[in-house]
């Protein structure tokens, strides 16, 4: 899947990618009388009282783990900056994933914000300054909780009583509206907050460009806490309602020249009203386009008798996203070949679900799905005669993996080590997708022509529990009967 612009790994102390000068277009008077006039005669505007956000204790626990791991190191976690689209227009800002995970600040995070871990002096001992390994261990024992003071730096919006209110399009409330103050954010997130102007970088700062830090922060997200799982269930539920919107308006897609675009827009409308945005670019692939794994052009027709593969997810305000795929018969009923392929993919998905539990390795979930795919295409006679058993010929029809971790990023924890991801032992709290598929491209001479142009994927979001796993998206129609009834109901 293709993620939207995420503003990752950028310099600190800036909110925009480039400096924009609009002097050639227009300018305001700098006359003192005008400035005085603009800065006076404003009445008080009531604001919502700040309250502690439910994420605060969870984010604090995450920061404590980071602090213990990087004792004596000054860590600088930047939110990132707005990315330029053209001239003085910018993409919607999305903070760096690790910044959001450690602060709890999601969709309304301030561009240019910086989270800083300053070592506590009494804990400032490391391998470089210690004489023995016991020195390091002893210091850690003395500083069993936080070994840093943590400060969140960001620029408040400029109020009506400053020149920047109307003269600065980056922070002026005349331009961007009122934003939470330092005090409000401090109360909500349980963090010490200071103006970004007070932030000073040092030569020893460890930033997100540091491979060890980036790796640790990604691995920190491998097991989700209760808050995260609840947010992901919200995202999945919102996504399910978005799929309902698409199904209920499928007629408008069928009658449009670019019906896939209608499907995409229908889901986007729901994502923006029910959440923050989509978690990644929507794949609305009808007919043979479903055989293109990351089809995001979405400019084709939606025709009766074909299948529609919809791969989409709502990102909620906390920035956690769902990642769901359903493949539906546009006419409301699968033909025999479509049904044959669909039921095979469903069987593969169910086989993967069945083995997902604590104690097995992550890749064993994938292996269970692939075993079904391999056996079915062999039974259908699609594989070479006497194939080399060591070669996965069946992967011609499903080249992607079955599972990936899910969270704030659609492909979460991507910088985790292989032994912590692909070869990891499943633990309660891990959240990942199960998404087997089969794709038979037009012109594939290894399969009968009646299979050409059929692409099917079924994707659900799974959380590992103490004694097994739970399908967060089980309520979204999956079986042949459920899917057919779903489409038929929507197209009445």
Report the location of each language-model feature.
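Active-site neighborhoods and metal-handling regions in enzymes and metal-associated proteins
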Residues: 1-492
């Amino acid at each position: 899947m293709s993620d939207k612009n995420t503003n990752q790994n950028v310099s600190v102390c800036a909110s925009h990618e480039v400096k924009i000068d609009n002097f050639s277009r227009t300018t305001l008077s700098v006359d003192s009388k005008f400035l005085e006039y603009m800065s006076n005669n404003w009445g008080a505007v009531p604001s919502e009282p700040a309250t502690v956000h439910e994420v605060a204790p969870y984010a604090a626990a995450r920061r404590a783990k980071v602090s213990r791991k990087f004792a004596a190191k000054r860590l600088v976690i930047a939110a990132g900056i707005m990315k330029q689209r053209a001239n003085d227009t910018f993409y919607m800002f999305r903070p760096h994933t690790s910044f959001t995970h450690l602060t709890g600040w999601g969709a309304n995070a301030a561009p240019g914000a910086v989270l800083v871990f300053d070592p506590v002096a009494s804990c400032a001992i490391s391998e470089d300054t210690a004489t023995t390994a016991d020195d390091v261990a002893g210091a850690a024992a003395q500083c069993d909780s936080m070994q840093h003071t943590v400060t969140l730096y960001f620029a408040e919006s400029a109020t009506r009583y400053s020149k920047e209110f109307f003269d600065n399009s980056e922070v002026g409330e005349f331009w961007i509206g009122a934003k939470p103050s330092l005090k409000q954010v401090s109360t909500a997130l349980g963090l010490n907050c200071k103006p970004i102007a007070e932030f000073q970088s040092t030569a020893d700062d460890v930033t997100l460009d540091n491979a060890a830090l980036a790796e640790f922060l990604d691995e920190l997200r491998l097991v989700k806490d209760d808050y995260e799982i609840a947010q992901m269930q919200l995202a999945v539920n919102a996504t399910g309602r978005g799929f309902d919107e698409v199904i209920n308006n499928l007629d408008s897609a069928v009658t449009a020249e670019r019906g896939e675009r209608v499907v995409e827009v229908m889901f986007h409308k729901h994502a923006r009203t029910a959440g923050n945005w989509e978690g990644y670019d929507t794949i609305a692939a009808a007919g043979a386009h479903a055989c293109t794994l990351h089809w995001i052009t979405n400019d084709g027709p939606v025709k009766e008798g074909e299948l529609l593969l919809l791969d989409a997810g709502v990102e909620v305000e906390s920035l956690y996203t769902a990642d769901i795929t359903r493949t539906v018969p546009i006419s409301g009923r699968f033909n025999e070949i479509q049904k044959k392929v669909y039921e095979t993919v469903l069987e593969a998905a169910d086989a993967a679900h069945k083995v997902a539990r604590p104690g097995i390795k992550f890749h064993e979930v994938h292996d269970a799905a692939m075993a079904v795919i391999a056996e079915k295409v062999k039974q259908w006679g699609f594989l070479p005669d006497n194939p080399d058993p060591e070669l996965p010929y069946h992967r011609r029809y499903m080249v992607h993996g079955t599972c990936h971790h899910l969270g704030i990023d659609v492909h979460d924890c991507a910088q985790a080590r292989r032994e912590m991801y692909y070869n990891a032992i499943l633990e309660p709290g891990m959240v990942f997708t199960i998404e087997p598929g089969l794709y038979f491209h037009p012109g594939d001479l290894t399969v009968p022509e009646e299979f050409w142009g059929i692409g099917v994927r079924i994707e659900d979001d799974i959380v590992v529990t103490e004694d097994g796993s739970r399908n967060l998206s089980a309520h979204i129609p999956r079986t042949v009967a459920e899917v057919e009834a779903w489409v038929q109901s929507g197209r009445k």
